[in-house]
């Protein structure tokens, strides 16, 4: 990424981990965004088909429950009326057009971070735009990301439950098997995550094309029976319903939001498919299919108000219910898979940005580096999903918990989007506010409507999100305290080199690489090696690993070396926050710059800290213990940076935190 010379120098954001071995610098260049259109090696239509299978799974399965829940909320126990149906349809239509189409598809998809999207990418883009540390943007990014994790638990539960619930309509005797079958499907889904999804991912696009085609045909048949339902296109019905129904209108608005959940995924998956394929898939296929189905459900309920109980499945003849249940189950599994994969990617980005400790990462594909599996995250999601299914039992109960997490993320995206439009795109503040403020107002309206369901279940994603945000806060705060304590005993590297030149220790052959967070000071492992072994290698490398504010960095920017004496060199390796750090592979690039790197004659020295809790650390004891637990759960630096274990020497120290 080019550096703006007018800025004078690159400004660094340092986020330190529990030991020097996995300290990471966040480096940002103050420069304008270079818009990328995502992968260009595959054909446009192949990418469009792929986006239909991955990006739109969540929002594409919303017709299973969104219209049903919204009309039930509007009726509030009373008979369903034409005014209610048209009001709900109009609200759904304009919510999809304003929140998803205008805000995400037409606006935020242009706010890419070197081709990548998502809440944390937007946060990093905003930080870069401001050119300084912004705790406000960091807080927004953390809240948005935390709520996405909560959403990642609810989406599989409500989607699969809604699909399997169709069995009750086909065969009432199967009603008692809905929850057990849902649990079985979800357990199998999470169990196969470690094997990767490469074998079945190619079928996601075609299956979802069949799904969207089917729901569009189902809707078109019923619209043909009662074309008057198309009157709901007029926004008058939406406004009239809200103004005339008071609190019930606000409650209904919370249920209508179910129709746009998953809209944020369009932005999160930007890097996988590119802007134009996602826009084409949404505008010309997915959006029309969804609207036709929603209006078809409306036409059905207008002709038979009792159909609202199972409005989606009642759209087909009885003998087609079971095949539709099968197709719906496949679609919801695909939607769940996309959300689970998104959670892995989000946590991985958080780790790279220093917001979480290094969790174990397994790569499930030799050809696609982005296909990863995080065992701890998988277990956490499985436990959360199982608890939701067993506690709430039905999609209607879960609907109360759904929405609050997504609406929170959307509000955060809107505010961070304003910063990017204002500072990075160089729009006038008033113009940027005029563009983004209406979207934030709409998002806040949905957020307020979902808050009304706090006691009915909305507390669940808020609890998950608060726990996640608390974990990130603890990790950041504990890391900061650890840095302060380390600073007090650190020795400047230049002072040590001068001292060693005057009184050189015994020199041994080979190269020693010392991982550190700050190359200006002596790595702890180097100090202990001199203190206990009383030797110095022929070549000593002080290695710093940085994470950029961009998803990827060019190979030309990966490696930088500075020779500071005959025996000492400083090396900086730089990775994007979506790249897997591979230290030996990156160091091999150094050969092109004249450094003869040989892995077999190189030893990597890693310092590992043993932490103890202290009431005087600045954090409450419970936070001390949480930070220590997070530190212990972190993956080894050798594994994370893919360093051969046979070439690693670990040096331990004890620190009171």
Curated annotation (Swiss-Prot):
GO terms for cellular component: membrane; plasma membrane. It is a multi-pass membrane protein. InterPro entries: K+_transporter (IPR003855), K_trans_C (IPR053952), K_trans_N (IPR053951), Kup (IPR023051). It comes from the Bacteria. GO terms for molecular function: potassium ion transmembrane transporter activity; symporter activity. One of its GO terms (biological process) is potassium ion transport. It is found in: Cell inner membrane. The keyword Transcription does not apply. Pfam families: K_trans (PF02705), K_trans_C (PF22776). The keyword Transmembrane helix applies. Its main location: membrane. The chain crosses the membrane at residues 40-60, 88-108, 135-155, 172-192, 198-218, 241-261, 282-302, 320-340, 380-400, 402-422, 432-452, 454-474. Belongs to the HAK/KUP transporter (TC 2.A.72) family. Transport of potassium into the cell. Likely operates as a K(+):H(+) symporter. This is Probable potassium transport system protein Kup 1. It comes from Bradyrhizobium diazoefficiens (strain JCM 10833 / BCRC 13528 / IAM 13628 / NBRC 14792 / USDA 110). The gene is kup1.
């Amino acid at each position: 990424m080019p550096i703006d010379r007018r800025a004078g120098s690159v400004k660094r954001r340092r986020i330190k981990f529990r030991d020097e071995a996995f300290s990471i610098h966040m480096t940002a260049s103050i420069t304008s965004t270079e818009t990328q259109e995502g992968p260009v090696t595959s054909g446009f239509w192949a990418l469009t088909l792929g986006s239909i299978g991955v990006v739109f799974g969540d929002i594409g399965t919303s017709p299973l429950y969104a219209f049903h829940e919204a009309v039930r909320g509007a009726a509030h126990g009373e008979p369903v009326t034409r005014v209610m149906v048209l009001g709900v349809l109009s609200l759904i239509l304009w919510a999809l057009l304003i929140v998803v189409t205008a805000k995400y598809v037409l606006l935020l998809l242009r706010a890419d971070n070197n081709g990548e999207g998502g809440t944390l990418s937007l946060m990093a883009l905003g930080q870069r735009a401001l050119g300084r540390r912004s705790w406000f943007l960091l807080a927004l990014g953390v809240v948005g990301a935390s709520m996405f994790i909560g959403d990642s638990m609810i989406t599989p539960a409500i989607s699969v439950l809604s699909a399997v619930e169709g069995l009750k309509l086909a065969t009432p005797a199967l009603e008692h098997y809905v929850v057990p079958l849902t649990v079985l499907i979800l357990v199998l889904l999470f169990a196969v995550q470690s094997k990767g999804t490469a074998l079945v991912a190619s079928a996601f696009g075609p299956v979802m094309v069949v799904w969207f085609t089917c729901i569009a045909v189902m809707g078109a048949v019923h619209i043909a029976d009662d074309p008057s339902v198309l009157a709901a296109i007029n926004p008058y019905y939406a406004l009239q319903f809200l103004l005339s129904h008071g609190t019930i209108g606000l409650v209904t608005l919370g249920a209508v939001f179910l129709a746009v959940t998953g809209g944020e995924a369009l932005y999160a998956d930007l890097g996988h498919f590119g802007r134009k394929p996602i826009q084409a898939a949404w505008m010309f296929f997915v959006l029309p299919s969804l609207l036709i189905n929603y209006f078809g459900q409306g036409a059905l309920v207008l002709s038979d108000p009792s159909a609202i109980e199972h409005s989606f499945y009642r759209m087909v003849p009885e003998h087609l219910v079971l095949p539709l249940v099968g197709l719906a189950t496949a679609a919801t599994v695909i939607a769940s898979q996309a959300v689970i994969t998104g959670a892995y990617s989000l946590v991985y980005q958080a780790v790279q940005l220093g917001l979480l400790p290094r969790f174990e990462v397994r790569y499930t594909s030799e050809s696609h580096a982005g296909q990863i599996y995080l065992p701890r995250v998988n277990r956490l999601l499985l436990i959360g999903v199982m608890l939701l299914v067993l506690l709430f039992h039905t999609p209607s109960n879960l609907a109360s918990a759904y929405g609050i997490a997504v609406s929170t993320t959307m509000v955060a995206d809107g505010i961070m989007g304003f910063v990017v439009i204002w500072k990075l795109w160089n729009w006038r503040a008033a113009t940027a506010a005029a563009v983004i403020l209406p979207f934030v107002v709409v998002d806040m309206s949905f957020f307020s409507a979902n808050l009304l369901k706090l006691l009915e279940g909305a507390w669940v994603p808020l609890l998950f999100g608060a726990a996640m945000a608390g974990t990130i806060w603890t990790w950041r705060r504990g890391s900061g305290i650890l840095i302060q304590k380390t600073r007090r005993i650190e020795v400047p590297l230049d002072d040590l080199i001068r001292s060693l030149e005057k009184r050189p220790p015994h020199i041994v052959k080979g190269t020693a690489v010392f991982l550190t967070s700050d190359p200006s000071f002596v790595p702890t492992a180097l100090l202990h090696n001199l203190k206990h072994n009383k030797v110095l290698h022929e070549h000593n490398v002080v290695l710093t690993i940085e994470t950029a504010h961009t998803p990827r960095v060019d190979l030309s920017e990966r490696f930088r070396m500075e020779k500071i004496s005959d025996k000492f060199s400083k090396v900086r390796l730089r990775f994007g926050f979506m790249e897997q750090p591979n230290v030996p592979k990156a160091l091999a690039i150094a050969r092109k710059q004249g450094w003869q790197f040989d892995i077999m004659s190189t030893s990597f020295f890693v310092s590992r800290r043993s932490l103890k809790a202290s009431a005087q650390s600045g954090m409450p004891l419970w936070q001390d213990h949480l930070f220590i637990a997070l530190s212990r759960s972190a993956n080894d630096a050798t594994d994370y940076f893919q360093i051969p274990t046979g070439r690693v020497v670990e040096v331990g120290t004890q620190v009171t935190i």
